Each structure stands twice: as C-alpha cells, then as structure tokens.
C-alpha cells in the first residue's frame, strides 16, 4: 500500500509539474536578478553589474502564446578606465516597462520578444573612490530597447534570461546606447 501511495504521489506531482497555464488565465510574477550592462560607442568601457527587480503580469492567450507586461527597476551603465589613472562608473538606473510576446515552444520553455520603454531615475558618476555625484553628461529621460530572451518555468518558478538591445541614445550629446543582459528568477502566482 505504501508503494502505491508513493507511485501515485509521484505521478500527480509530474502532472502538475508539466501543466501549462490555462488559456485565458492571468498570473503575476515578482522577480529578482542580476543585470550586466554596458554602453555601446564608449571606447574601453566595461560592464557594470547590478540589480534588476520588479513584477510582471502575464495573460495566456493560447496554448503556445502569452503576452506580458511588467515594471522592473534596473541598474545599468558602464565602467571605464582612463589612461590607467581614473576609474569611473556611470550609474544609469531605470524603471523599465517590458511588453513581451512569449511563445512556448515546449512545455515550460518560452522564446520572448518585445519592446521596452525605460524611464531614467538616476544618472550618477563615481570617480575613483569619491562619492557618486550627478553626471554632467545629461541622460535621456526615456530609453527604448528591444528585449529578446528565453525563459524556463518549473513548478511556477521561472528562470528568465534576456538581452535588452538599446535602440535609442542613452545621453543627449553622444551616440552611446544601453546594452544589457539580465538573468532573473521569479515565481508565478495565478490570479
């Protein structure tokens, strides 16, 4: 009897593990992770590693297609070294609003593509070991990027990896654009 209960429990857990969200359902997903950012067109720049955190909502439109929108705080920018004398970190922080189409190619695995407006909330520069100050290079207040990614969901946990390809200038007087790779872990709550 004990063996039958164990086998039945394993079978039920595997069914719930591979269950797709029902068509027409909504879910909410808090998520947190790491962003690895850089600025294009900045010679000698290096990645700035930072936090990305927020929430996304998803609507399951069909068995294979869902649409999602979210609000994510993202630390972006870049580091640079000038003539081996000055280390500078450009700290661009954004509130990003990703709007994504998610195509589930197999159960749990989604390919993602969308558009993401971002709103600059901080533009500071830190030079050597001094305190960060407002950056004299004025950042654009709105940033636009194209997010492309993959996610995998298991037991409502979702691991998401995406690249945000900047299509608008990050600053008013340069051609530098944001280039950001993000990895997040979230948990989906059905509504």
What is the role of each PLM region?
Residues 30-34, 51-59, 71-73, 97-103, ...:
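Residues on the lipid-exposed face of transmembrane beta-strands in outer-membrane beta-barrel proteins
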Residues 21-23, 60-62, 106, 154-157, ...:
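Outer-membrane beta-barrel channels and translocator barrels
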Residues 79-113:
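Helix-adjacent hinge/juxtasegments
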Residues 70, 76-81, 89, 134-191:
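Predominantly the C-terminal beta-signal and adjacent terminal strand-loop region
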Residues 40-46, 79-86, 123-131, 171-176:
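Outer-membrane beta-barrel translocator domains and adjoining extracellular loop/strand segments
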Residues 23-25, 42-50, 88-94, 137-143, ...:
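Transmembrane beta-barrel outer-membrane domains
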Residues 1-31, 185, 189-191:
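Bacterial Sec-dependent N-terminal signal peptides
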Residues 20-61, 67-68, 166:
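Short glycine/proline- and aromatic-enriched beta-strand/turn motifs that initiate or cap beta-hairpins
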């Amino acid at each position: 009897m004990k063996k039958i209960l164990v086998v039945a429990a394993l079978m039920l857990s595997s069914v719930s593990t591979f269950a797709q969200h029902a068509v027409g359902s909504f879910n909410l997903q808090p998520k947190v992770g790491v962003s690895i950012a850089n600025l294009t067109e900045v010679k000698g720049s290096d990645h700035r590693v930072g936090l990305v955190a927020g929430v996304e909502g998803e609507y399951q439109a069909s068995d294979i297609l869902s649409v999602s929108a979210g609000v994510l705080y993202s630390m972006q920018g870049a580091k640079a070294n000038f003539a081996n004398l000055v280390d500078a970190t450009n700290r661009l922080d954004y509130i990003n609003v990703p709007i994504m189409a998610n195509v589930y190619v197999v159960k749990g695995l989604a390919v993602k593509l969308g558009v993401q407006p971002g709103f600059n909330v901080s533009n500071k520069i830190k030079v050597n070991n001094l305190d960060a100050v407002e950056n004299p290079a004025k950042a654009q207040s709105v940033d636009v990027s194209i997010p492309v990614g993959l996610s995998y969901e298991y037991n409502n946990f979702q691991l998401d990896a995406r690249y945000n390809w900047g299509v608008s200038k990050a600053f008013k007087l340069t051609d530098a654009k944001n280039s950001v790779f993000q990895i997040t872990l979230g948990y989906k709550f059905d509504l």
